[in-house]
Amino acid sequence: MLRWLLLAGLLSCVVVLLALDAEAAKRPVAAPSNVATKVNFPPYPPYMLYPVRVGIVQRQSSARIAVWSDGAVFIDFTPIFELKKGLVYQIADGRITEYATGRFCNLPVDKRARIASRDFQVWCNSRWWRGSLEIIQFPGKMTVINLLDIENYLMGVVPSEMPASWNIEALKAQAVAARSYAYAHLDGGSKWLRNEGYDLVPDVRDQAYKGRAAETAKTNMAVAQTQGVILKDSGRVKPGFYRAWVGDFFENLNMRKKPVPNKQLEQITGVPNIVGVTVRSWDANANATDIQIMGKKKTREVYGVKLASMLGLQTAGILDVKGEGESWVFTYRGPGNGARGLSQHGANMLADRGWNWQQILQQYYQDPDGRLRLEYMDKYHTVKATKPPEPVAKDKTDETE
């Protein structure tokens, strides 16, 4: 009897162990440790002169990723988990899990995990990004950072900030402004780096950045043809602040106004008893070329630049004149717009009027002392930028207005 009881107990143990083994076989298992033999590419793109870190997922509980070609998860420079082309992975709860099989790997809390593919194109949360990804873990949350070279970053910024259908010279000006902004906010210039671990965010708090899907051949050409060029003022980087349409076209040209009392204008021009001041013609760049000053007994026509000098205006040209009470209000373009930055719509209008990208940038960022320079970033070969030529007026038959 005892023998039968012992045999029955032994059979029960075998059944339980088999059941546990079957259950264990259904559970996801950690990745094998031989990944290093299959991966022959680094965890981030080579030849990055100026790496940019963009926080594309900010303190969220999860994210989804995929790779364009075979990839891997790295800790430092060591690959620990293979990523297969065409499969989707979830990052959550301190691990990366392959949806199709349940295969996973745990991520260390004290180190950044890096995700890269052979061609350095990675999908994350419905968008493709150039470069690679970095994962930072916080208690119950995680951040995904897109790591890439500044020039590749700009390929996703320029079409996100300015329509690709716009004039190529405006797109080039946008590329330089965006590059200057990014360059000025790398490392110590970033307000996000200390607490969040990245340089920039991909929205209007810094610059719109929609990744690889936003790219076009035309905007990529604008980036390539201005490669490495930034704005500098007295040897310091000038952050390329810019904005969309604000007010009318004249406001985008850094419009300023100066009221001149009637008596003062009479003394300056030598026309007594002024009854009217009229702009009779403009050049293709909106500068007044012929201003008529009418008195009761005398009329004089003055070239716009000369009258601006007579009035003591620091300007490239007078734009308009209107009478207000006992004064004449002259609207003119200021010497630059370093505080407000590039107007995107204004830049496109100027480009359509024949301005090149250097002239557009000089218009919006130059200060009264003329210290603005277009120079290469420090690690690019240094070329002293020459002062851009003055805009050339087109024939009236070529004007768009």
Language model feature labels by segment:
Residues 2-401:
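Conserved, single-site charged/polar hotspot
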